[in-house]
Amino acid sequence: MLMLWTFAVLLGAVAGREVCFDKLGCFSDDAPWSGTLDRPLKALPWSPAQINTRFLLYTNENPDNYQLITSDASNIRNSNFRTNRKTRIIIHGFIDKGEENWLSDMCKNMFRVESVNCICVDWKGGSRTTYTQATQNVRVVGAEVALLVNVLQSDLGYSLNNVHLIGHSLGSHIAGEAGKRTFGAIGRITGLDPAEPYFQGTPEEVRLDPTDAQFVDAIHTDAGPIIPNLGFGMSQTVGHLDFFPNGGIEMPGCQKNILSQIVDIDGIWEGTRNFAACNHLRSYKFYTDSIVNPTGFAGFSCSSYSLFTANKCFPCGSGGCPQMGHYADRYPGKTSRLYQTFYLNTGDKSNFARWRYQVTVTLSGQKVTGHILVSLFGNGGNSKQYEVFKGSLQPGTSHVNEFDSDVDVGDLQKVKFIWYNNVINPTLPKVGASRITVERNDGRVFNFCSQETVREDVLLTLSPC
């Protein structure tokens, strides 16, 4: 293997070739594009005719059937494209296609909350080949996206501030290439698990980086090393804000057995995709869910996921927490620094949104060994029961824990407490919570009190105090 790698690098030292295309410019296979340790195999991108990039326009007026548009201004004017709306351009990755359901599903969620031009980029002619070749085709597709955006600006007077590129996997780096060609003037780029092989550790001109747009955010869901984890996504931070949900490596719900993964509820094809790259695909599923859950993906500033799970990163800072996904651009400090890193937990099924709470329970009653659980009730809904502590329950002691609720309970109105130990005790001990304090991630604190104690498995309701 080492000899093969060395041979490939030496082969890359040969004088490079170049290919040029009308309106797009010239592309070389010299370093840093090829012939390096990170990109040992030399290749030139395919022609636009061979890749056959297509732009599929969905709008609020045509949410189910796309209009095919080109970088011709008259063609765009005759479509449902509206210059008084934001434009979000979704770009798929390796082996994928622009007509895959997830892209149009993302558009449809957008139509639920905004009026928008939603363009799905189909470059399957260049993505369904060897990975090495696809990474080179990225450059041409990025140039074509940039050409479309430049026509919007020059011929339709459209502001690049209103352009948002959303790329998955290799699509993230296509967005980066388009951003470079528009000199960072595009309003926003979102990288959905940017592809790692041939990009991690490469110079900024090769990959997505924070200078490619006015604001760049990224979601990392498959950031384990390619060997041995088969992690397809980058662990390297690439934006102003980088989110690592669930630690960024293993996503909840992706550890099913082979049969259950392939015989998926969405069908054999989707199930097979999930089995092969479940973690990698989670990034666009999280983003799609975030569109209709504007407060359900709060990211917490933290130096590591282990500290986050140890409850060392709550609550949000004075500027609040950024929301991973669609509403990340609402964060006041979004461009104050580069490579800001945030952690959060998500659900494991279709509803991925979670709301984090910190609960402090001060015990009363008798000393026993057991588990204490609480459930939250508010004007937005009710949570399940979550365990706060297990061990020796002593009156006067306080126990703190954080949990992620699948319901945003809103402003809290009451809390219910319960304890159990599953041990037969003829004395029938009673335990209570004299005070329960609940803090939301926005720093809002709610206090509840009770003077009562209850036996095992009996609910105790605490009222505001």
Curated annotation (Swiss-Prot):
Its EC number is 3.1.1.3. The keyword Phosphoprotein does not apply. Inhibited by bile salts, is reactivated by (pro)colipase/CLPS. Disulfide bonds join C20-C26, C107-C118, C254-C278, C302-C313, C316-C321, C449-C465. InterPro entries: AB_hydrolase_fold (IPR029058), Lipase (IPR013818), Lipase_LIPH (IPR016272), Lipase_N (IPR033906), Lipase_panc (IPR002331), PLAT/LH2_dom (IPR001024), PLAT/LH2_dom_sf (IPR036392), TAG_lipase (IPR000734). It catalyses: a triacylglycerol + H2O = a diacylglycerol + a fatty acid + H(+); 1,2,3-tri-(9Z-octadecenoyl)-glycerol + H2O = di-(9Z)-octadecenoylglycerol + (9Z)-octadecenoate + H(+); 1,2,3-tributanoylglycerol + H2O = dibutanoylglycerol + butanoate + H(+); all-trans-retinyl hexadecanoate + H2O = all-trans-retinol + hexadecanoate + H(+). It comes from the Eukaryota. Keywords: Calcium, Disulfide bond, Hydrolase, Lipid degradation, Lipid metabolism, Metal-binding, Secreted, Signal. Ca(2+) binds at E204, R207, D209, D212. It is found in: Secreted. The active site is at S169 (nucleophile), D193 (charge relay system), H280 (charge relay system). One of its GO terms (cellular component) is extracellular space. Plays an important role in fat metabolism. It preferentially splits the esters of long-chain fatty acids at positions 1 and 3, producing mainly 2-monoacylglycerol and free fatty acids, and shows considerably higher activity against insoluble emulsified substrates than against soluble ones. This is Pancreatic triacylglycerol lipase. It comes from Mus musculus. The gene is Pnlip.
